[in-house]
Amino acid sequence: MKLLEQIEKWAVETPDQTAFVWRDAKITYKQLKEDSDALAHWISSEYPDDRSPIMVYGHMQPEMIINFLGCVKAGHAYIPVDLSIPADRVQRIAESSGAKLLLSGAEVTVTDLPVRITSEDNLKDIFFTHKGNTPNPEHAVKGDENFYIIYTSGSTGNPKGVQITYNCLVSFTKWTVEDFNLQTGQVFLNQAPFSFDLSVMDIYPSLVTGGTLWAIDKDMIARPKDLFASLEQSDIQVWTSTPSFAEMCLMEASFSESMLPNMKTFLFCGEVLPNEVARKLIERFPKAAIMNTYGPTEATVAVTGIHVTEEVLDQYKSLPVGYCKSDCRLLIMKEDGTIAPDGEKGEIVIVGPSVSVGYLGSPELTEKVFTMIDGERAYKTGDAGYVENGLLFYNGRLDFQIKLHGYRMELEEIEHHLRACSYVEGAVVVPIKKGEKYDYLLAVVVPGEHSFEKEFKLTSAIKKELNERLPNYMIPRKFMYHSSIPMTPNGKVDRKKLLSEVTA
């Protein structure tokens, strides 16, 4: 598959087909090509001998998709940065990535960034001034060059830039379209922010098949009335989201085949799909296929998939995450470094062309988890699991990195920022489960000196500081105050004891 050529052919074959919809804004395939060509031409003229990544800032604006394609046509990887990401984190991404340019689809509220900022109005001028100019196709990202870089949580307090190459993305997109039987011209739900790699599961499968991306933004999700009004208008046929989002939608009785009569495929990734959620979806959408997938950001979104049928639901209380894509393979590694036999738990290791080339500018971190096996790139996921008859079963994290509502995070990073807060002497973050999956984060805090009379006021002050450093989804929901952190006999934090206090 030639990814960019495949997207561009729709500008010729179906130029007036809508490529992307967000509220009242939409772009056609013709506009997508013209504007991304104009932008790529401008980037190449401004940065002729430069291949540094480009930050793309915004939320669900159509310009985001134009900017992504404009970057890669000019030979630059893009770094998606959502509006919800705090200023401090945006600053660290800008500094660590070596980016020289930021393209914005919305007002940039972060100050003193060490990059050139191209505003929304600047972009409109570029689209107009450079209209009709086409970039040199030889300059476009290809092969093992980076296509996008997504920043994920890092245990040192600094986010890690996962480098995904053109070849990685082609392998993923081809597999998604073929294995999940996606058709030409379908409407895809775009629920995940672009800085979350789940969004890649809808963006590129939609664009290469001439589909329409129907974007749902965070304000709609916060107002269910607006959300369901948008869904009713959408005629979505391919649903891509975390299971949690679908579970939230199922609380609305009208969320069913009557609302979305042409629904064909549900693609789930990012967290555990509970058996009962899949069962309800089959009841509400009997003609749709429910697909459960698994994969870390470091292996390009997902590498396994399974069609969840009623037979699968009856057979497995905890659902399998699927069979590996044909160009990759899974190894289950025991602690001694040997490969575990069928049915035995160990660390999931992914081998093949889906695997990232590593973390941008972090060779030491890269060496810890990326390796070569039989001449192919391999990634040690840190996830526990086992394989039985070719089916992968996921058993949570081996360390303290978790998935919460689809977002991956390292508890150590949250603890790092908690301990840096003014009123905190010590802190531990404990993830609290509800059923099979994590429901919220609890912060256990040893407070420093303060003058607050009530604990809730202290909590508000700590949360205010955290809001300046971390995305909202990484901020603990509940706080508990202790005079000291309990320890195990071998000197480690006694997380089990803390957990028992909460669940008692």
Swiss-Prot record:
Known pathway: Cell wall biogenesis; lipoteichoic acid biosynthesis
CDD domains listed in its UniProt record: DltA
Disulfide-bonded cysteines: none
Keyword Cytoplasm part of the UniProt annotation: yes
EC number: 6.2.1.54
Subcellular location: Cytoplasm
Major place of residence: cytoplasm
Protein name in UniProt: D-alanine--D-alanyl carrier protein ligase
PROSITE patterns per the UniProt record, alphabetical: AMP_BINDING
Family: Belongs to the ATP-dependent AMP-binding enzyme family. DltA subfamily.
One GO cellular component term: cytoplasm
GO BP, sorted A to Z: lipoteichoic acid biosynthetic process
Keyword Nucleotide-binding applies: yes
Gene, per the UniProt record: dltA
Residues holding ATP: T152, S153, N292, T293, Y294, G295, P296, T297, D383, Y394, N395, G396, R397, K492
UniProt GO MF annotations: ATP binding; D-alanine [D-alanyl carrier protein] ligase activity
Role description: Catalyzes the first step in the D-alanylation of lipoteichoic acid (LTA), the activation of D-alanine and its transfer onto the D-alanyl carrier protein (Dcp) DltC. In an ATP-dependent two-step reaction, forms a high energy D-alanyl-AMP intermediate, followed by transfer of the D-alanyl residue as a thiol ester to the phosphopantheinyl prosthetic group of the Dcp. D-alanylation of LTA plays an important role in modulating the properties of the cell wall in Gram-positive bacteria, influencing the net charge of the cell wall.
Catalysis: reaction(s): holo-[D-alanyl-carrier protein] + D-alanine + ATP = D-alanyl-[D-alanyl-carrier protein] + AMP + diphosphate
InterPro entries associated with the record: AA_adenyl_dom, AMP-bd_C, AMP-bd_C_sf, AMP-binding_CS, AMP-dep_synth/lig_dom, ANL_N_sf, DltA, DltA-like
Lineage: superkingdom: Bacteria
Enzyme class (EC, first level): ligase
